């Protein structure tokens, strides 16, 4: 009798555990994955790391930007081109587009307004590899870079440029760019 009771208890326990193991899987929504890119018919493809980048200009004292024409130290950044084919084009140049600080400074990006307060009398300049400040109209291209087959890097620099005595605050600016192949 004890063996029969023990067998019933063991069989009951096994059937309960197998029922739990056979329980239906639970599926929940996890989120969204965005895939973003572009297929281009060009001599090169802009590297994904160059498409959307942030250049850290750091903190600069207002005393360094106390008068019109004063600049901060320049910070380098690159636009990398991949899978270049020199049979298609042998040179590349880049144009930047952004809002100029004013009509007299078409090569100085205006700062974005900030809830915390933006710096005034200062903007951002973009310099090509020759050190020339680029006009930010999207149509004035940098000096040309001779392409090699494969990967190419086009160097630029950015710096703050004072249009008067700078006041403190956030100093962020944005520009888009396009590449011209010849």
Swiss-Prot record:
<comment type="function">
    <text>Fimbriae (also called pili), polar filaments radiating from the surface of the bacterium to a length of 0.5-1.5 micrometers and numbering 100-300 per cell, enable bacteria to colonize the epithelium of specific host organs.</text>
</comment>
<keyword id="KW-1015">Disulfide bond</keyword>
<dbReference type="Pfam" id="PF00419">
    <property type="entry name" value="Fimbrial"/>
</dbReference>
<protein>
    <recommendedName>
        <fullName>Type-1 fimbrial protein, A chain</fullName>
    </recommendedName>
</protein>
<feature type="disulfide bond">
    <location>
        <begin position="44"/>
        <end position="84"/>
    </location>
</feature>
<comment type="similarity">
    <text>Belongs to the fimbrial protein family.</text>
</comment>
<dbReference type="InterPro" id="IPR008966">
    <property type="entry name" value="Adhesion_dom_sf"/>
</dbReference>
<dbReference type="GO" id="GO:0042802">
    <property type="term" value="F:identical protein binding"/>
</dbReference>
<dbReference type="InterPro" id="IPR036937">
    <property type="entry name" value="Adhesion_dom_fimbrial_sf"/>
</dbReference>
<dbReference type="GO" id="GO:0007155">
    <property type="term" value="P:cell adhesion"/>
</dbReference>
<dbReference type="InterPro" id="IPR000259">
    <property type="entry name" value="Adhesion_dom_fimbrial"/>
</dbReference>
<dbReference type="GO" id="GO:0043709">
    <property type="term" value="P:cell adhesion involved in single-species biofilm formation"/>
</dbReference>
<feature type="signal peptide">
    <location>
        <begin position="1"/>
        <end position="23"/>
    </location>
</feature>
<dbReference type="GO" id="GO:0009289">
    <property type="term" value="C:pilus"/>
</dbReference>
<keyword id="KW-0732">Signal</keyword>
<keyword id="KW-0281">Fimbrium</keyword>
<dbReference type="InterPro" id="IPR050263">
    <property type="entry name" value="Bact_Fimbrial_Adh_Pro"/>
</dbReference>
């Amino acid at each position: 009798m004890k063996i029969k009771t023990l067998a019933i208890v063991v069989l009951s326990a096994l059937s309960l555990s197998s029922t739990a193991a056979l329980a239906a899987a639970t599926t929940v929504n996890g989120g969204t994955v965005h895939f973003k890119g572009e297929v281009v018919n060009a001599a090169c493809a802009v590297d994904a790391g160059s498409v959307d980048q942030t250049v850290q200009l750091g903190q600069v004292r207002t005393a360094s930007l106390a008068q019109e024409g004063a600049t901060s130290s320049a910070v380098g950044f690159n636009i990398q081109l991949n899978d270049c084919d020199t049979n298609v084009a042998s040179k590349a140049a880049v144009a930047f587009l952004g809002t100029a600080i004013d009509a007299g400074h078409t090569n100085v990006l205006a700062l974005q307004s900030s809830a915390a307060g933006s710096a005034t009398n200062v903007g951002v300049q973009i310099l090509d590899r020759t050190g020339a400040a680029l006009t930010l109209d999207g149509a004035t291209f940098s000096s040309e870079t001779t392409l090699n087959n494969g990967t190419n890097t086009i160097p630029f620099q950015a710096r703050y440029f004072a249009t008067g005595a700078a006041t403190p605050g956030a100093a962020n600016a944005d520009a888009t760019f396009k590449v011209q192949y010849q």
